[in-house]
């Protein structure tokens, strides 16, 4: 199995519900190590750039507004098949379709207020990690 890194963002709704620790416990209990983390208030420019892949989609403006509406917790997760494992832990984008016990089933409100973001591929994970973290901020353990 491949050791990978992925990005996880705990979105403003989940930060506001004070469930960061509960989400971190799920990562750790499932073999993912947090090797970098920061709390950040995203600027409009940062949110627009980070989600630029969606700029032509109808939900883009609302997503950018939501992601700048409060602080987020951004972390780099490391472990075997980290990208897939994190996506399994997150659950479906729509919390009504998310499997019981997933982060979104337990903490998300709707398809647009859905608690967490996670990279969808190893390639995108590398780009997303580099967007928020320098190599010196990542501490393998």
UniProtKB/Swiss-Prot annotation:
Active-site residues per Swiss-Prot or TrEMBL entry: 117 (pros-phosphohistidine intermediate)
Positions contributing to ATP binding: 11, 59, 87, 93, 104, 114
Enzyme class: transferase
InterPro entries in alphabetical order: NDK-like_dom, NDK-like_dom_sf, Nucleoside_diP_kinase, Nucleoside_diP_kinase_AS
A Pfam family: NDK
CDD domains associated with the record: NDPk_I
Highest taxon listed in the record's lineage: Bacteria
Catalysed reactions, semicolon-separated: a 2'-deoxyribonucleoside 5'-diphosphate + ATP = a 2'-deoxyribonucleoside 5'-triphosphate + ADP; a ribonucleoside 5'-diphosphate + ATP = a ribonucleoside 5'-triphosphate + ADP
SUPFAM superfamilies, per database record: Nucleoside diphosphate kinase, NDK
Cofactor: Mg(2+)
Keyword terms: ATP-binding, Cytoplasm, Kinase, Magnesium, Metal-binding, Nucleotide metabolism, Nucleotide-binding, Phosphoprotein, Transferase
Primary subcellular site in the record, as a coarse category: cytoplasm
The keyword Repressor appears for this protein: no
Molecular functions per Gene Ontology: ATP binding; metal ion binding; nucleoside diphosphate kinase activity
Catalytic activity, EC: 2.7.4.6
Subcellular location: Cytoplasm
GO cellular component terms, A-Z: cytoplasm
SMART domains xref list: NDK (SM00562)
Protein's GO biological process: CTP biosynthetic process; GTP biosynthetic process; UTP biosynthetic process
Family: Belongs to the NDK family.
Subunit structure: Homotetramer.
Described purpose of this protein according to its UniProt entry: Major role in the synthesis of nucleoside triphosphates other than ATP. The ATP gamma phosphate is transferred to the NDP beta phosphate via a ping-pong mechanism, using a phosphorylated active-site intermediate.
Full protein name: Nucleoside diphosphate kinase
């Amino acid at each position: 199995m491949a050791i990978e890194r992925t990005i996880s963002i705990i979105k403003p709704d989940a930060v506001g519900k004070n469930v960061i620790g509960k989400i971190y416990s799920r990562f750790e209990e499932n073999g993912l190590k947090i090797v970098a983390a920061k709390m950040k208030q995203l600027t409009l420019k940062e949110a627009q750039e980070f989600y630029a892949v969606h700029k032509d989609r109808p939900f883009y403006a609302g997503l950018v507004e939501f992601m700048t509406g409060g602080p987020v917790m951004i972390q780099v997760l490391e472990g075997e098949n980290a990208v897939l494992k994190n996506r399994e832990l997150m659950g479906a984008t729509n919390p009504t379709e998310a499997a019981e016990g997933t982060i979104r089933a337990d903490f998300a409100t709707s398809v647009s207020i859905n608690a967490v973001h996670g990279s969808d591929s190893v390639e995108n994970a590398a780009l997303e990690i580099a967007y928020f973290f320098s190599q010196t901020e990542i501490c393998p353990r």
